Amino acid sequence: RDPEMSRGLGDVYKRQVCFLSHNWKNDTEDICIVPEEIVSEATGGTYRRAITAELNRNVLSGEFDRIVSIGQVVPHEVVGMANYTKNLLVGVGGRDMINQSHMISAICGIEKIMGRENTPVRRIFDYVQKNFLDQLKITFMLTVTCEKHQDSDLYGFYIGEERETFSAACRLAEKKNITWLPKRAKKIVTWLDPAEFGSTWVGNKAVYRTRMAIADGGELLILAPGIKSFGENEEVDSCIRKYGYSGTETIQNAYENGEFNGIEMAAAHLIHGSSDGRFKITYAADPKLMPEEIMRSVGYEWTDIGPMMKKYQPKGKETGWYEDNGEEYYFIKAPAVGLWRVKGEA
């Protein structure tokens, strides 16, 4: 049994239920091709390439009376608002859609996508839904939740088969999961639960969700006691170690030279995870899990998690403005479930 699954699902995992772990490299079948002209239209002409959509063959087997897709609607760096058809086309989808959707978001610009319902990638997903997914019996169960007092509060629960189910959830998520600050913060401190975040691939949600609220020349300090790798698999991890978070121009040039063929999602991640020199990104990590020289080798700053835990005391701390010895900072206890922006900025 998978200890991570057991920890996440609790008693549900102990029941006589079959849990299938999706292998996006080997478990999929092609369902349709999104034509080049549709992709170009969806991206405003910035991306011209046909995309193959795939699904896990178990979803396509016809053995089930009903397919239920459950997930949380929350701001997302690739599709704008997470879940709905993303749960299928990426969650149990294949390499091409995963790679191309990530690259589209990087090229179009993360600031124009985060927290928005109608985005280039969502329009591509809508095409696949209209031309294939609507043939399947899929019920979407979508939640809108917020972190509150060390727990998650459920604010909305939407059930249906139509696009409007997702749109309704998005309208609530825009109100509950986007925080508007009165000004840009010179310093933002975020907390990553070690039980959830073991890689920068996942941990960099702290970068994506806060970047629009950090002042030029400011700093993002990520308290990450569980960080021990960069990628979630060896292929992506080695790619991150090779190129580092070296900035949009460097990564995009490498991409255009064909250096990321078949692993475009890594290129997109490296673009999303760079501040392009606008602000400093520092990971506070356990030196036994992530040594200083390794973290610095990919372009991030590093500091020891021990002293930072004593200084900022993140456990039990609520999101908000704080001051430490004359230094003002904004603390975020759960960056992965929100988006922080500044009032008056587009």
Regions found by a protein language model. Give the residues of each.
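Short glycine-rich anion-binding loops that position phosphate/pyrophosphate groups of nucleotides
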Residues: 72-75, 194-195, 287, 335-337
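Conserved, well-structured core segments that form the ligand-binding/active-site neighborhood
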Residues: 15-180, 212
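Glycine-rich phosphate/diphosphate-binding loops and the adjacent beta-loop-alpha structural elements
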Residues: 145-161, 184-202, 209
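Extended hydrophobic packing segments that form well-structured cores
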Residues: 276-346
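Single conserved hydrophobic/aromatic residue that forms the stacking wall/gate
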Residues: 2-13
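Short acidic, glycine/serine/threonine-rich loops at helix termini
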Residues: 29-36, 78-83, 151-156, 201-202, ...
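C-terminal catalytic subdomain
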Residues: 197-289
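Structural motif
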Residues: 68-70, 187-191, 221, 330-331
